Every structure is written in C-alpha cells, then in structure tokens.
Amino acid sequence: MVICIGSSMPEIYRSGSYSCLIVENSDLITVNNTVLDIFDQFDAWDRALRETIETTADIQKMLELSFPIFENPIVVIDSKFHFLAYSAIIDRRDDMLAFRPDNNNMFQKEYLSLSLRDTNFTPKKREPFLMICNGNTHFSVNLYHGDRFIGNLKIAFVLRPFRAGDSILCQYFSKLVEMAVSKLHSISDGRERKLTHIFRTLLLGTPLSNLDRQFVST
C-alpha cells in the first residue's frame, strides 16, 4: 500500500494498481481508519472463507463471500467442464449469459472453445494464466487434488478492470477454493471406497455390519 500526500492525484493511482485514494485534506486519523478498514475487510473475508472450508466446504458460498473483493463474476468447473459453482450476479445480468451453464451444466460452447484456443489449455498447466476476451482480462487457474486435475477457477474482469494487485489475490483465493474442492473429493473418494467394500461383501454373501447398513441407508 502507498499513501501519498500533495495537492493533486499521484500518477501511480491512474495505473489502476491501487484502490484507495485519500484526499489531500484528510487528517491522520482518517488515513489510519481507512487503512484499518481495508485490512479488516480482507481479514474478515479470509476468516469467513476458512470457516466455510472447515465446515461445509460450500464453494458457492465462497464465491458469494468473494464477490465484494473481486467485484467480478467467478466460475468454478470440474475436470469435465461441468459447473461446480458460479457467482449469483451471472443469473441477474443478460450481458453475462456466456458465463451461465448450458442445459448440460457445462460452459457455453462458444466461450469454452475460445478459452481452449486462446490459452492452449491443458490440465497439466499448474501456473495461473490470463486470457483476453472481448477486451476484458480473464484470470484462470487449474485446481488439483494432489497430482490429479480436478477443475478450474475463472474470474472474468468485466465489471471493473484487472489491476496489478489482483493477480496475487486471485492466486490466494484459488488455493482456498482448491482446498474446498479437494475436501469434497476426499469425501467422495471415501464414500466410493466404502461402497466398493460393501458391494464386495454382498457378493461374498457375508451379512453387512450395523455400521455398513447405516452407511447404505444415509
């Protein structure tokens, strides 16, 4: 963060890298409170995201918590390009139709083909990448569960422009989303292993234990 004093807007602010402008007649208390408000906002955001991961791992909730931070629509898809979650604003604005899932809960074909063509997309691409679509910057990063590709996160900067400081923030957020998706995959993998065990037990003609019966009924 850079705090400048003077009688005119500093040139660096025009670059779009900074989101806080303090006017020349602000006193020290106002400046201090403004800085604290910024830190409080990001601290509350981080705590809310981590609490969500620890409890429900609700990806949709994580996206809604993050809209005030990025001020742009966010989409999370799985390894087969099916939607896991997307920002609620996408359904409220017709100009965001391209980011809505189609009838198969997948990306619109036109946007998907553009993404694949313009970024040379590959599931092995671990570093974040940017693409330009209709003059707007789109941040994209793949998600992994260990070494396994499990999806992708995209933030389309169509409401406010992409700033230099957004890159590290997007990467940090993507790691938290990755933790949530990985947790859901771990739960799913555990259920699959349990069901396989129960199926083999039934094939052998062995009675199920009370715990196995309870698992099947839930």
Which residue stretches match the model-derived regions?
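Hydrophobic, helix-rich cores of sensory/ligand-binding and other regulatory modules
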Residues: M1-T218
